[in-house]
């Protein structure tokens, strides 16, 4: 008798699992959504990246990580450059107090890789120039 009850329970479970299953249906949102045209939106940071700032290291707006590609700059010399900003001209970076002769030579050799633009709050607010939070 126990075996018969077990057999009927197993058969009921098997039939119930196939019969009671209803496939999920996804909602078609394409008919509900309003058609929209793509719009190019530029904020102040994106607009600045289209200038020379996007191609060179901006001494007034770049963060410390931007100097990693330059040999001998990261982190000490880059930190001095950032601490003494803003600059009026690229050559002003050579007048930073406390630079060694080696550091001045490195700066002189890489002046063409730098640019100077007006400081933008999008890039320099909140001391993000030392730790931009990119990990």
From Swiss-Prot:
Q: Which residues form the signal peptide?
A: 1-26
Location comes to: Cellular thylakoid membrane
Q: Name one GO cellular component term.
A: plasma membrane-derived thylakoid membrane
Principal location listed in the UniProt entry = membrane
Provide the family line.
Answer: Belongs to the PsbU family.
Top-level taxon in the UniProt lineage = Bacteria
Any GO BP annotation: photosystem II stabilization
Q: What UniProt keywords apply to this chain's record, in alphabetical order?
A: Electron transport, Membrane, Photosynthesis, Photosystem II, Signal, Thylakoid, Transport
**Subunit structure comment from the entry:** PSII is composed of 1 copy each of membrane proteins PsbA, PsbB, PsbC, PsbD, PsbE, PsbF, PsbH, PsbI, PsbJ, PsbK, PsbL, PsbM, PsbT, PsbX, PsbY, PsbZ, Psb30/Ycf12, peripheral proteins PsbO, CyanoQ (PsbQ), PsbU, PsbV and a large number of cofactors. It forms dimeric complexes.
Q: NCBIfam families annotated for this entry? A: PRK02515.1
Q: Give a yes or no for keyword Ribonucleoprotein in this entry.
A: no
Q: Sorted alphabetically, which InterPro entries does this protein's record hold? A: PSII_PsbU (IPR010527)
Q: What is this protein called?
A: Photosystem II extrinsic protein U
> Which gene produces this protein?
psbU
- Kindly give the Pfam families that the UniProt entry links to this protein: PsbU
Please report the record's description of how this protein sits within the membrane: Peripheral membrane protein
Q: What does this protein do?
A: One of the extrinsic, lumenal subunits of photosystem II (PSII). PSII is a light-driven water plastoquinone oxidoreductase, using light energy to abstract electrons from H(2)O, generating a proton gradient subsequently used for ATP formation. The extrinsic proteins stabilize the structure of photosystem II oxygen-evolving complex (OEC), the ion environment of oxygen evolution and protect the OEC against heat-induced inactivation.
């Amino acid at each position: 008798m126990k075996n018969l009850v077990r057999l009927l329970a197993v058969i009921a479970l098997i039939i119930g699992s196939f019969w009671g299953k209803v496939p999920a249906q996804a909602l078609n949102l394409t008919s509900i959504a309003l058609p929209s045209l793509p719009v190019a939106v530029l904020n102040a940071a994106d607009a600045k990246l289209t200038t020379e700032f996007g191609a060179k290291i901006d001494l007034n707006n770049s963060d410390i990580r931007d100097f990693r590609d330059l040999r001998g700059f990261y982190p000490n010399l880059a930190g001095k450059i950032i601490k003494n900003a803003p600059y009026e001209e690229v050559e002003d970076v050579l007048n930073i107090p406390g630079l060694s002769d080696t550091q001045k030579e490195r700066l002189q050799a890489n002046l063409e890789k730098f640019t100077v633009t007006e400081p933008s709050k999008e890039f320099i607010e909140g001391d993000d120039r030392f730790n931009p939070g990119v990990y």
